[in-house]
Amino acid sequence: MRKLFTSESVTEGHPDKICDQISDAVLDAILDKDPNGRVACETAVTTGMVMVMGEISTKCYVDIPKLVRETIRGIGYDRAKYGFDCETCSVITSIDEQSVDIAIGVDEALESKKGEMDKLDAVGAGDQGMMFGFATNETKEYMPMPIEMAHKLSRRLSEVRKNGTLPYLRPDGKTQVTVEYENGKPVRIDAIVISTQHGPEVYLEQIEKDIKEHVIKVIVPSELLDENTKYFINPTGRFVVGGPQGDSGLTGRKIIVDTYGGYGRHGGGAFSGKDPTKVDRSAAYAARWVAKNLVAAGVADKLEIQLAYAIGVAKPVSISVDTFGTGKMTDEEIVSIVNKVFDLRPGAIIRDLDLRRPIYKQVAAYGHFGRTDIDVPWERLDKVEEIKKHI
């Protein structure tokens, strides 16, 4: 049976991704000075303006306007002709402390209040909710091919802009890849869509030629392309006005880009700007860590795990898995292995993945999962041998 599946990515200059990177820059700056700081930082951008808001409890001081301007400069919005300038945009901040009611549940979990605790039971989940982790062996990154290819194309777009290969490119851009599957395995790429912001002096014909030569051919293996592959490069014909001048942006608006491109389910909680006591982030990272190690250990070819939490309670209220018919054992047996090998209380996740560190801005663009260009703890295959002992 053949089917098509499509995923998209965006560049670091996309308005929503600007916001994600600013929120995580603030988080990293606080964790660097105060590893126990509590951060829930949201950002909004529009023409000529950035607003940073949220709830932050910390003993340290960070210069938020300076962080905002440095982040925007690093992305590439450093002159007025790009429609957004790190030097002249206004920066508005509105920061409160974390709610005392939330802090009570995080600082002392329900298990602690009942006296049923060890040290790690003392950290309660920062909110209720469900988080999903996913892995598949269809790529070496253990990621679905559509999102993996889309991210690589987006990263390449920024690379050729920054290194001067295509100097007329500007920071905003999007990619989309449609993969054809046969009997559950990727066999070819059916369509590639790339929209990239550019200077007014360049024509579409030149952009199409350059993107195919310097982006697509460099990234996509030739054996996945054929005479029937369709290319859509700046299909509107012109993309000069972009970034926050073209669209307003918000933190947490690209949660599918951040994860599995729609191939795996999503619990709905965004990542950026949240410290690791927020299970929206830390438990989603842990779920990816669990799923990737299980697939690498040969438990299944494809696996999705769901974790669910109650606010102020340390232990997950439920754990479930789905192997989509590829499992080498029952789902119940896999859950049993998960409970034996992994400790999924928030305090244990923070400890085992060493999450109280400034490591988040680097994943705020081009995906939080499947990253081989950087070292992030939830991508490590450090539990494979232990899992195999239980198979």
Curated annotation (Swiss-Prot):
The keyword Metal-binding applies. It is an enzyme of class 2 (transferase). Keywords: ATP-binding, Cytoplasm, Magnesium, Metal-binding, Nucleotide-binding, One-carbon metabolism, Potassium, Transferase. Homotetramer; dimer of dimers. Mg(2+) binds at D16. L-methionine binds at E55, Q98, D247, K278. Belongs to the AdoMet synthase family. Pfam families: S-AdoMet_synt_C (PF02773), S-AdoMet_synt_M (PF02772), S-AdoMet_synt_N (PF00438). It comes from the Bacteria. Residues 98-108 are annotated as: Flexible loop. ATP binds at H14, D172, G173, K174, R238, F239, D247, R253, K254, A270, K274. PROSITE patterns: ADOMET_SYNTHASE_1 (PS00376), ADOMET_SYNTHASE_2 (PS00377). PANTHER family: S-ADENOSYLMETHIONINE SYNTHETASE (PTHR11964). It is found in: Cytoplasm. GO terms for molecular function: ATP binding; magnesium ion binding; methionine adenosyltransferase activity. K(+) binds at E42. Pathway: Amino-acid biosynthesis; S-adenosyl-L-methionine biosynthesis; S-adenosyl-L-methionine from L-methionine: step 1/1. GO terms for biological process: one-carbon metabolic process; S-adenosylmethionine biosynthetic process. Binds 2 divalent ions per subunit. Binds 1 potassium ion per subunit. Catalyzes the formation of S-adenosylmethionine (AdoMet) from methionine and ATP. The overall synthetic reaction is composed of two sequential steps, AdoMet formation and the subsequent tripolyphosphate hydrolysis which occurs prior to release of AdoMet from the enzyme. Its cofactor is Mg(2+); K(+). This is S-adenosylmethionine synthase.
